[in-house]
Amino acid sequence: MRKLMTATAALCACAVTVSAGAAWADADVQPAGSVPIPDGPAQTWIVADLDSGQVLAGRDQNVAHPPASTIKVLLALVALDELDLNSTVVADVADTQAECNCVGVKPGRSYTARQLLDGLLLVSGNDAANTLAHMLGGQDVTVAKMNAKAATLGATSTHATTPSGLDGPGGSGASTAHDLVVIFRAAMANPVFAQITAEPSAMFPSDNGEQLIVNQDELLQRYPGAIGGKTGYTNAARKTFVGAAARGGRRLVIAMMYGLVKEGGPTYWDQAATLFDWGFALNPQASVGSL
């Protein structure tokens, strides 16, 4: 449940900087006196403490955008709730009929839930998402389970329309930077998810034995202390990301949505690193509220 304070209460309780004239839901917020956070491609973002749930700063963190493949974290949570990692499914043609990114699921081949989770979280396989949905009772049933899980977690602005995050008959879906962090925190509390999202690579079945699949979260290579994340992109969502990093005994989580990368400007990874660096440099007692 959101516990972010209103702008008035925040100013009374703990000196917060809010953009002039903006409502709390549509404001830049960070502790007063803290170093200004540079702009970057993401139009909405949030920085929070992964363990305590304290929000360190945000920009339009409650404004909804399509989540793209970051919604796969929610699918993974449902799968981990309901499936044995060693349970198997034989993929059918419908599972593989997906706009790629794909991990290489083949009709007629048997896969374990764990293999599909690797393909889902490391390379954002839409075919893996479809096949997990197959295991969970079909696309419609799975989407309903995902939305029920989001509601249970307090991610009340999140609405999945497909298991993969691709546009579906119900549109592009929606989430917020706040909700993506709430969902990712819950996922990181699951040891299997935390292990998979931190893997730099894994092996996945192919026609020629096992093939190496490489984690698309470039922060694992670029940012010391990165411990996992999930990327996303569609034309409607633009660039999205949610992920976590650890330093000095602290763990922070960020979410970034609707990234508009400009030629010559900072990349999405640059902005992610900036948000983490800013958060780790902030006094651990400073915050603007809680998730």
From Swiss-Prot:
The keyword Cytoplasm does not apply. InterPro entries: Beta-lactam/transpept-like, Peptidase_S11, Peptidase_S11_N. It comes from the Bacteria. Its EC number is 3.4.16.-. Keywords: Carboxypeptidase, Cell shape, Cell wall biogenesis/degradation, Hydrolase, Peptidoglycan synthesis, Periplasm, Protease, Signal. It is an enzyme of class 3 (hydrolase). Inhibited by the beta-lactam antibiotic meropenem. Inhibited by the non-specific inhibitor phenylmethylsulfonyl fluoride (PMSF). One of its GO terms (cellular component) is periplasmic space. Disruption phenotype: Deletion of the gene results in reduced growth in acidic medium under low oxygen conditions. The mutant shows better intracellular growth and survival inside THP-1 cells compared to wild-type and complemented strains. The colony morphology and antibiotic sensitivity of mutant and wild-type strains are similar. The double knockout mutant pknI/dacB2 shows smoother colony morphology on solid agar and exhibits defective biofilm and cord formation. The active site is at S69 (acyl-ester intermediate), K72 (proton acceptor), S124. It is found in: Periplasm. Residues 1-22 form the signal peptide. SUPFAM superfamilies: beta-lactamase/transpeptidase-like. One of its GO terms (biological process) is proteolysis. Pathway: Cell wall biogenesis; peptidoglycan biosynthesis. The keyword Mitochondrion does not apply. GO terms for molecular function: serine-type D-Ala-D-Ala carboxypeptidase activity. Belongs to the peptidase S11 family. Overexpression in Mycobacterium smegmatis results in reduced growth, an altered colony morphology, and a defect in sliding motility and biofilm formation. Overexpression of the S69C mutant shows similar results, indicating that the effects produced are independent of protein's penicillin binding function. Probably cleaves the terminal D-Ala-D-Ala dipeptide of the peptidoglycan stem peptide. Shows significant D,D-carboxypeptidase activity in vitro. Acts on the synthetic penta-peptide substrate Penta-DAP (L-Ala-gamma-D-Gln-DAP-D-Ala-D-Ala). Also shows weak activity on Penta-Lys (L-Ala-gamma-Glu-L-Lys-D-Ala-D-Ala). The catalytic domain binds weakly to peptidoglycan in vitro. Plays an important role in the maintenance of colony morphology and cell wall permeability and integrity. This is D-alanyl-D-alanine carboxypeptidase DacB2. The gene is dacB2.
